[in-house]
Regions:
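A short, structural motif
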Residues: 1-76, 83-95, 106-114, 126-134, ...
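Surface-exposed amphipathic alpha-helical segments in non-transmembrane regions
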Residues: 75-85, 216, 230, 237, ...
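Hydrophobic, low-dielectric interface segments
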Residues: 96, 127-135, 169, 176, ...
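A glycine-rich phosphate-binding loop feature that marks nucleotide/adenosyl-phosphate handling sites
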Residues: 100-103, 136-143, 159-161, 196
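EAAAR-patterned alpha-helical heptad-repeat segments
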Residues: 114-121
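Acidic, Ser/Thr-rich peripheral helices and adjacent loops at domain boundaries
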Residues: 152-160
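Glycine-centered helix-coil hinge/cap
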Residues: 190-204, 221, 272
Length: 275
């Protein structure tokens, strides 16, 4: 397509790679206008992450849908992933693996992509990432939803409320920030009991690891879950900035020149009369 050729001539990716990325958007049911608007931010994400363009497109289209977002949300979604990649020990592929395990449940419970990603990024900094992180977080989601009274009563014992003044459940980031705030004051046994109540017997050790990491980060002035969520709500331009940084060196400029040359070859080839 003309858009694929345009992207091939002006970015590090070839026209063929751009066409592959567009094909994933088509498979996701995007219309032509959405594809034309969505390809540039996906290109930025792939360049920022130094990853395969088609794979980036596949991840974006899959998990936009899982989080109940639309094609028009593509730019914000890729900025969220780019910000998380830049500010935590994870990458786009690992985020995709984590989303696969927990995004649908998060959406069904009303948790946003921002707070879900904030928790996953914090988990990654504690060494829990990818599908392992997504599975653990999915267990926490499920326990909070199906074992609400027991979780609420247990947390209330330590001064953490899962409901606001109007009786509505607090956001995930608020609940986890509250737990992290009291975690360091609990005995080992109290920590284990609380973790089992919230995450279940199969995943409680992951929650212990996460909270230990959060307590350490808080002691060093790091971001809380709520702070990270707020940052992700205001991360516009992250993917574009990271892509520019990745390509702003001699190797990046050579890649762009090669891509432009490939685009020129296509254009010349199309203008030549048939033999």
């Amino acid at each position: 397509s003309d858009k694929a050729k345009e992207m091939g001539a002006s970015t590090k990716f070839t026209a063929g790679e751009s066409a592959d990325a567009l094909s994933y958007m088509a498979l996701a049911g995007w219309n032509t206008q959405s594809m034309l608007e969505g390809i540039s931010p996906v290109l930025n994400l792939a360049a920022a992450a130094n990853m395969d363009l088609a794979q980036a497109s596949d991840i974006v289209t899959d998990y936009l849908t899982a989080f109940g977002l639309k094609a028009s949300d593509t730019t914000h979604f890729v900025d969220i992933m780019a910000y998380a990649m830049a500010h935590s020990n994870t990458d786009v592929i690992q985020l995709g693996e984590a989303y696969k395990a927990c995004a649908s449940t998060a959406t069904s419970l009303g948790y946003s992509v921002e707070e879900t990603t904030a928790v996953l990024a914090t988990m990654a900094n504690a060494g829990v990432k990818g599908g392992e992180a997504g599975t653990a977080l999915n267990a926490i989601f499920t326990r909070l939803a199906t074992n609400t009274k027991k979780c609420g009563d247990e947390l209330a014992n330590y001064g953490v409320n899962i409901y606001d003044a109007q009786g509505n459940m607090q956001s995930l980031s608020s609940i986890l920030t509250g737990i992290a705030g009291v975690w360091g004051d609990l005995t080992d046994q109290e920590q284990a009991n609380l973790a089992k109540t919230i995450a279940g017997t199969n995943q409680y050790s992951k929650l212990q690891t996460i909270m230990a990491g959060c307590s350490e980060a808080a002691a060093e002035g790091g971001q809380s879950f709520s702070d990270y969520t707020e940052a992700l709500n205001n991360c516009a331009g992250s993917a574009d900035k990271m892509a520019g940084t990745m390509l702003d060196n001699m190797n990046g400029r050579l890649v762009l020149m090669q891509s432009a040359a490939d685009g020129l070859k296509i254009a010349i080839g199309e203008d030549l009369p048939p033999a």
